[in-house]
Amino acid sequence: MMDDTRHPTRPYPEQQQQPPGQTAEMKPVPDHGEKSYKGAGKLIDKVALITGADSGIGKAVAIAFAREGADIVISYLNEDGDARDTAKWVEEAGRKALVIPGDIKSEEHCRDLVQRAVDELGGIDILVNNAAFQRTYGDITDISADEWDETFRTNVHAPFFLSKAASPHMKPGSSIINTTSIQSRQPSPQLLAYASTKGAISNFTAGLAEMLAEKGIRVNAVAPGPIWTPLIPSTMPAEKAAKFGENTLIGRAGQPAELAGAYVLLASDLGSYMTGAVVPVTGGEIMI
């Protein structure tokens, strides 16, 4: 385990929330880069649509993109307070924030998200398919068909719906970034449904990269390890949430801010020779 005094260390207090969870109720509150991220003009006047941008990784990416010069569509389910806070940080960076609640399991809503980005912000240059649903289970017999379907519709169908709707509006040089997971390569049995969707997203990324290459649209993914977001205390038993991330080489859960740079890389000209790639940010866990 590595010593790191800049970030909260384990164990965290035992805690549990109702899904999808609220940032303000977490102990410690995640770091989204509010104080630490410094932009360098890598995304000047770009428009980015980010799902799950109200909290966690999506919030950190929204803050980073805004500080790099992008306007942001903040897509979220119903966590209004968290979404307003993200919008505040985007606007403090001098950029526009378009806040749109709704269920991305609906293809109609996904089409509306893209159309509003085009109509109200002038286009779409970056799509970040980040929102996800997960639950833990002790046995396959504990997983209902409805929960299996909800996991796939949120984690797999929605990125398909959004990529399908967005790609006709995207110019050469645009970028689609999917959030997969170390679970795509090292599935935990307790996360059977979630891990299955993340394996699907890794393959979706590779296939879509080939499909859109002739249009000049790059498609990549980021594979986080254990990251401290509202998803954790709202979907895991309290005792597991307290120890979350302790088995990594870093010895702790990652903070959302620690992933933002990977998304900036893939969204910007720094990643212009990258497509079909999966970038691991795992705290030292090896993706086999």
Residue ranges and their predicted role:
Residues 4, 26, 34-35, 137, ...:
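Short C-terminal tail/terminal secondary-structure segment
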Residues 80, 101-114, 145, 257-258:
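The beta1-alpha1 cofactor-binding region of Rossmann-like NAD(H)/NADP(H)-dependent oxidoreductases
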Residues 121, 169, 252-281, 286-287:
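C-terminal substrate-recognition "lid" of short-chain dehydrogenase/reductases
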Residues 138-140, 144-149, 244:
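Substrate-binding pocket helix/loop in short-chain dehydrogenase/reductase
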Residues 163, 197:
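Active-site helix of classical SDR
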Residues 168, 210-214, 272:
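Alpha-helical segment proximal to the catalytic Tyr-Lys
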Residues 181:
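Residue(s) in the substrate-gating loop at a strand-loop-helix junction
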